[in-house]
Amino acid sequence: MRKFEAIMQKIVGKEKVLGGTTTQASNILGPGHIKNHAALPSWIGEYDGGVSERVNMISETFSAYGLEMIAADDVKKRKWMKLFALTAIGPLSAIFDLNHTELYIDNKNQSISRNLGKEIILETRKVALAEGIEVSEDECLFMFNKIVDSKQT
């Protein structure tokens, strides 16, 4: 467990701390105009692992109101899943001064940028494996592929 989760648990009690992650991908085109690029689910679970009644209740409530949320038995792995996509999108967007749409979707050289993004993710996977997070290549590429292959709405 990272230090900040331990601090939160110490302050409010372990029973009050859940883990979770969400990924929303969009661009603001102008006042009142937003392009959504990824309808990805959010994940929630007991921080130390497992799905409890409260996790199921929260997941079902959010999903009922239009934000898909999945009860996760291994929320630490889900956090890594998000990190995989972020390692490929954030740094390359900054280096090339392009948002993720310009870099991976509307780019005539998107096959080059996508391959570079995938290589970054596979390198990040090595770190996850060293940290004891078991994740396949397909799993670590899942969120990245959902974002870069998504239809813009």
Each model region followed by its residue ranges:
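Alpha-helix initiation and N-capping motif
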Residues: 5, 89, 137-141
